[in-house]
């Protein structure tokens, strides 16, 4: 099963402003398990990329909020998740693009975010 997770940064990831509950180590383990990961944020794309690179995470995409439909068109996955902290931006954009939406404190307990194996296996 191929899983794609889009992360908001501010209010979602620990490196955000304000900091969120999801750690970069959690994101790294998720990516290493074979899940497609990237960011969808209000931050400039260059700033998003710099965060991933600073933490040694091989991200698959870094886009602005309105580009979530482009992510879905580019990557074939069985399920698409967006994790964010705002109703007006994160949740609305995610649902409009056909992503399932999770608040950070909900997502942290989901098994697909805490995988140890290869998510691409059936």
Predicted segments, located by residue:
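Short low-complexity, flexible loop/linker segments enriched in glycine and/or proline
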Residues: 53-55, 116-121
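Conserved Lys-Pro-Asp/Glu-containing loop-to-beta segment of HAD-superfamily phosphomonoesterases
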Residues: 65-88
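Acidic, Mg2+-coordinating phosphoryl-transfer loop and its flanking beta/alpha structural elements
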Residues: 81-117
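Alpha-helix termination/capping residues and helix-transition junctions
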Residues: 54-56, 74, 96
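Short, well-ordered alpha-helical microsegments
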Residues: 45-49, 68-70, 89-91
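Short, acidic/turn-prone active-site loops that include or flank metal/cofactor-
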Residues: 63-69, 106-110
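Alpha-helical substrate-recognition element adjacent to the catalytic core
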Residues: 1-65
